[in-house]
């Protein structure tokens, strides 16, 4: 999926996009040490996860498009984030889905920041490398739209 940064807002607030276990509450913040598996790429260029945080990629701002890609076929769930089509690198993230296998998009916004998420392949402005119309999620079948 991708998120268009509609407004980067002021210096206070949060804008992070990524993945989490479906059991994670949407009211949780980006606190390291949580028991649910999650990882995000934040507006300040850092990554945050339940396993820690650190330097990751470029900062982003209003008008940028952030792409989020996950390879669940790998044993470590390889996750890659993109800024305007350019890969920011690959991270590995363990998820404890309790056998459900549900990993969900995770978008954290507060303050004066907002964005627009696009889940349909034909709506993306930037297509991550390795993704084609034949291997992208078919949102028509997924959501019945």
Each predicted region: which residue ranges?
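PRY/SPRY (B30.2) beta-sandwich protein-interaction domains
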Residues: 2-145
């Amino acid at each position: 999926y991708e998120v268009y940064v509609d407004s980067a807002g002021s210096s206070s607030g949060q804008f992070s996009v990524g993945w989490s276990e479906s059991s994670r509450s949407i009211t949780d913040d980006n606190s390291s040490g949580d028991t649910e598996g999650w990882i995000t790429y934040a507006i300040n260029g850092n990554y945050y996860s339940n396993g820690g945080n650190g330097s990751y990629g470029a900062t982003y701002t209003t008008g940028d498009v952030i792409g989020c890609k996950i390879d669940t076929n790998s044993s470590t769930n390889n996750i890659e984030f993109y800024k305007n089509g350019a890969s920011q690198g690959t991270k590995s993230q363990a998820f404890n889905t309790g056998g459900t296998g549900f990993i969900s998009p995770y978008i954290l916004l507060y303050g004066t920041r907002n964005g627009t998420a696009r889940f349909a392949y034909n709506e993306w402005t930037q297509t991550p490398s390795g993704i084609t119309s034949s291997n992208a999620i078919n949102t028509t079948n997924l959501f019945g739209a």
